UniProtKB/Swiss-Prot annotation:
UniProt-recorded name of the protein: Signal recognition particle receptor FtsY
Enzyme Commission number: 3.6.5.4
HAMAP family xrefs: FtsY
Region: Disordered, residue numbers: 12-37, 51-86
Keyword vocabulary terms for this entry: Cell membrane, Cytoplasm, GTP-binding, Hydrolase, Membrane, Nucleotide-binding, Receptor
GO biological process terms on file: SRP-dependent cotranslational protein targeting to membrane
Biased composition (Basic and acidic residues): 51-72
GO cellular component, one term: plasma membrane
Pfam families for this protein: SRP54 (PF00448), SRP54_N (PF02881)
Residues bound to GTP: 192-199, 278-282, 342-345
The UniProt record lists the keyword Acyltransferase: no
Acetylation listed as a keyword: no
Organism: Mycoplasma mycoides subsp. mycoides SC (strain CCUG 32753 / NCTC 10114 / PG1)
Underlying gene: ftsY
Length: 400
């Protein structure tokens, strides 16, 4: 079995499996569970009546029985499949262009030579993954195809090299997940330039955790941009159905650190699970921004030394290499722990996340795949690589 087949099998299993560490249940889930138990009992009673036999099940027959899939498990599995379809749809443009170019190479070259690798590097450059990542992937492919230079092997080696270059051979990918933990106040700060979808992403993230049953508070600490707080208020009222709470300043240009202080105080006193902090997006004045972030960090660390648990930089995927520059600049003024890559559904060059990971060692944590409130998803490198390469690995045409 080749690498791509193994990766696809892993993704399929992951999509179908039910995680054991499920977050706390909301009231609807609890009600569903109760109804489900009642239905199971009723079915068992009916079975006994029909057979007119009370059969005692031995431990052996119990082992042989197929486990009943609970309603909650079924809902989770269906949600996971729905998320995978969203990612696949969001990557159609990137996958189409990438697969089309790889297929052109497969028709032109039957075996790999220096000229082939030059053209392969040109194709990789077009994905916006950056020159450093391009050379890394190209060199990995060369090493993996020394003995077998057939194009079938080259394609599989390309998929493995893309995966290996991003994950450093970590098959579990655990270190790339959002650092959210139970039984603590999780504090996440979002940074990024105006226009990238920072405030929208924050609202969607609030919805993401509120839907899982967590108590979420937002600190509107972008006191510089007119309309930033109003945007959050509108989101909370009209699209989040007031499921989350907000702490805001009394006036424009107020000290953002004071908003953070008030938010932390409220979050601690009222036992919130998550505090999301919106920040100003003006990178042009790095001195002021750095001072603001340092002041916020001091206030946060007075309460929790390990916080903020995430500093997430929001990057617009359609900006290409300009997004890489933004990541470089923000990493100078903030301890960025992860990337939220927005507008993945609007770009035909989906490699910017690979470029940032290679250049700055900052992983993608979440991706925006549409305009709906639930279109912010946890990033999964398995999904990304499978969908990016499925067009040329399966031999099927990827539709636009």
């Amino acid at each position: 079995m080749g690498f791509w087949a193994k990766l696809k099998e892993k993704l399929t299993k992951k999509t179908n499996q039910v995680e054991q560490d499920e977050p706390i249940l909301d009231q609807q889930d609890q009600q569903d569970q109760q109804e489900e138990q009642e239905q199971i009992i009723e079915k068992e009673i009916e079975q006994i009546k029909e057979n007119k036999i009370k059969k005692t099940k031995t431990s052996e027959t119990k082992k042989q029985e197929k486990p009943i899939e609970t309603l909650k498990e079924k809902k989770k599995r269906e949600k996971q499949k729905e998320k995978d379809k969203k990612v696949e749809k969001a990557m159609l443009k990137s996958a189409f262009n990438f697969s089309k170019d790889i297929k052109k190479l497969s028709k032109k070259y039957k075996q790999a030579d220096d000229e082939f690798f030059e053209e392969l590097e040109d194709v990789l450059i077009q994905t916006d993954m950056g020159m450093k990542m391009v050379l890394k992937v190209s060199n990995l492919v060369r090493k993996k195809t020394k003995r077998d230079t057939s194009f079938e092997n080259i394609k599989d080696a390309l998929v493995e090299s893309l995966y290996q270059a991003y994950t450093d051979n970590d098959w579990t990918n655990k270190k790339y997940r959002i650092d959210f933990k139970e039984n603590r106040l999780n504090i996440f700060m979002l940074v990024g330039v105006n226009g990238t979808g920072k405030t929208t992403s924050l609202a969607k993230m609030a919805n993401y955790y509120a839907e899982l049953g967590y108590k979420v508070l937002i600190a509107a600490a972008d006191t510089f941009r007119a309309g930033a707080t109003q945007q959050l208020e509108e989101w909370i009222k009209t699209r989040l159905n007031n499921k989350v709470d907000l702490v805001k300043a009394n006036k424009l240009n107020a000290d953002p650190a004071s908003v953070v202080f008030d938010a932390i105080k409220k979050a601690k006193e009222q036992n919130y699970d998550l505090l999301l902090i919106d920040t100003a997006g003006r990178l042009q004045n790095k001195v002021n921004l750095m001072a603001e972030l340092e002041k916020m960090n001091k206030i946060i660390q007075q309460v929790e030394k390990s916080a903020p648990h995430e500093v997430l930089l929001v990057i617009d995927a359609t900006t290409g290499q300009n997004g890489v520059i933004q990541a470089e600049e923000f990493s100078k003024v903030a301890d960025v722990s992860g990337i939220i890559l927005t507008k993945m559904d609007s770009t035909s060059k989906g490699g910017i996340g690979l470029a940032i990971k290679e250049l700055l060692n900052i992983p993608i944590k979440m991706i925006g795949v549409g305009e709906k409130v639930d279109d912010l998803l946890a990033f999964d490198i398995d999904q990304y690589i499978v969908h990016l390469s499925s067009g040329f690995m399966q031999g099927d045409e990827v539709e636009k």
